Regions:
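Extracytoplasmic
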Residues: 9-43, 247-252
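Residue-level signature of mid-helix packing/kink "hotspots" within the transmembrane helices
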Residues: 26, 54-62, 112, 146-147, ...
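Extracytoplasmic gate region of multi-pass secondary transporters
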Residues: 28-29, 226-282, 344, 348
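Helix-breaking motifs and short loop linkers at transmembrane-helix boundaries and internal kinks
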Residues: 40, 72, 93-99, 110, ...
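Conserved MFS/SLC helix-loop-helix module at the cytosolic interface between two early adjacent transmembrane helices
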Residues: 59-98
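Cytoplasmic helix-loop-helix junction between adjacent transmembrane helices
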Residues: 103-141
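Helix-loop-helix hairpin linking two adjacent transmembrane segments in secondary transporters
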Residues: 138, 142-189
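C-terminal transmembrane helical hairpin of 12-TM major facilitator-type secondary transporters
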Residues: 299-347
Length: 430
């Protein structure tokens, strides 16, 4: 029986939102070589500026998830996109270290609800067996945005100045809000464009996924936040995001300073790793859902889909630390990003196996907060490594070590004890 496909329109809007989100976020890293010269920033100062974004971002990742649970993702996403687009445009007014630091910190507040609200939307709109694929597809928009940021923002900055580039990409976000308000609703049942068969299929899938939820109404959100499995998943996503955020912030500077590329070639080559990241998100999602369908232990299927690529990304980072020529370095960075994004979407899909749907936004926001502390730590650590501890290579080795910690946390801790429910098909603990 045909069930309709309108839910994929919502997925496309989430994909575009992710692309805009990461284009906005990556823009500063792309123009950093120019800003360094104009504003006279040291590597350690630049690292602090990159990290300042994540102070506000981490806090509102948690708050945004709770708001999405309470007020619905349609309203929260509209507010978030409008706020971060305006604040991104205000980055163009920065005149020195202090004003740049403040503008990036405020910008982070606006972007904070992005991933937890996306996760809430996927829970509302998609059946359980499509979770990893849709997380992978929508999150792949983030790497598309990062890939576009290199050539587009870089070339705009060369032609019209770096301040103009921030104003242009801010306008894109404000335009997206119009489409989101026109075509998206909080749930399929609220949309006149969704047929009865599609709506019933999604609702039946989610009801079957949480058989104990109706009898668990009194369980408060906080009981899910500090379970070992929730904390271990947060550590795993911390490891994933640590290097991704280092690359978003420092890859352009690494390409220009360590690999000696000019601005034009850097802008073009920086798109390669993020294109591979898009493949990792979407391809990893397809593979993760294939494992999910084939394996009887559903939680183990999600764990393996998250930990194997994270371990491979650590090996790629060690390789990056050992090379100093352009082609091997770009290929190894691209491999690391591919494996990291494949692991990322599997981590978010694992969340759906640990938490009832009614608490998913809040718990996702909490895990998102944990994981995005890496954005405060990672860029600053790379800046210190460049200035004081032997350059970029030592920073990449540290990233590989963080990956290892994430792999061990998820493999050894996530299991039946921290699950919010026991699925009928999940017969053994991983």
């Amino acid at each position: 029986m045909k069930t309709g496909k309108y839910r994929y329109v919502v997925a496309l809007l989430l994909f575009i939102a992710g692309a805009i989100n990461y284009m906005d976020r990556a823009a500063l890293g792309v123009v950093a070589p120019i800003i360094n010269k104009q504003l006279g920033l040291s590597p350690s100062q630049l690292g602090v500026v990159f990290s300042s974004f994540f102070f506000g971002y981490s806090i509102f990742a948690f708050v945004g998830g709770q708001l999405a649970d309470k007020y619905g993702p349609r309203r929260v996403f509209s507010w978030a996109m409008g706020t971060w687009s305006i604040l991104c445009g205000l980055t163009a007014a920065a005149t020195g270290f202090g004003t740049l630091l403040i503008s990036r910190a405020l910008f982070g507040f606006g972007e904070g609800p992005m991933n937890s609200t996306t996760n809430r939307t996927i829970t509302n709109w998609f059946p359980r067996h499509e979770t990893a694929t849709m997380v992978g597809f929508t999150f792949s928009g983030q790497t598309v945005g990062s890939a576009i940021a290199g050539p587009v923002v870089g070339l705009i900055a060369i032609a019209y100045g770096w301040r103009t580039s921030f104003l242009i990409i801010a306008a894109l976000g404000l335009t997206w809000i119009v489409a989101w308000r026109m075509f998206a609703t909080d749930k399929p049942a609220q949309s006149a464009r969704v047929g009865a068969a599609e709506r019933e299929m999604v609702e039946a899938s989610r009801s079957a996924a949480h058989p104990a939820e109706g009898g668990d109404e009194s369980t408060p959100l906080r009981s899910y936040l500090f379970r070992p499995s929730t904390l271990a998943l947060g550590v795993g996503l911390f490891a994933v995001n640590y290097t991704l955020f280092v690359f978003i912030s420092w890859m352009p500077s690494y390409f220009t300073n360590a690999l000696h590329l000019d601005m034009q070639h850097m802008s073009i080559l920086s798109a390669v790793p993020w294109a591979c990241g898009g493949i990792g998100y979407f391809g990893g999602g397809l593979l993760a859902d294939a494992c999910f369908k084939r394996m009887s232990n559903k939680l183990l299927a999600r764990k393996l889909s998250a930990t194997v690529p994270l371990a491979l990304s650590g090996l790629a980072l060690l390789g990056v630390s050992m090379v100093d020529s352009v082609i091997p370095a770009v290929l190894l960075v691209a491999s690391a990003v591919l494996f990291l994004t494949a692991s990322s979407q599997a981590c978010w899909a694992t969340m759906h196996e640990l938490v009832p749907g009614r608490h998913l936004g809040g718990v996702s926001g909490f895990v998102h907060l944990m994981s995005n502390i890496s954005g405060i730590v990672g860029p600053t650590m790379m800046g210190l490594a460049v200035q004081y501890f032997g350059g970029y290579s030592s920073g990449f080795v540290l990233g590989a070590a963080v990956d290892l910690v994430g792999v061990l946390a998820m493999l050894l801790v996530i299991g039946r004890r921290g699950a919010a429910r026991t699925d009928e098909t999940q017969t053994t603990a991983a």
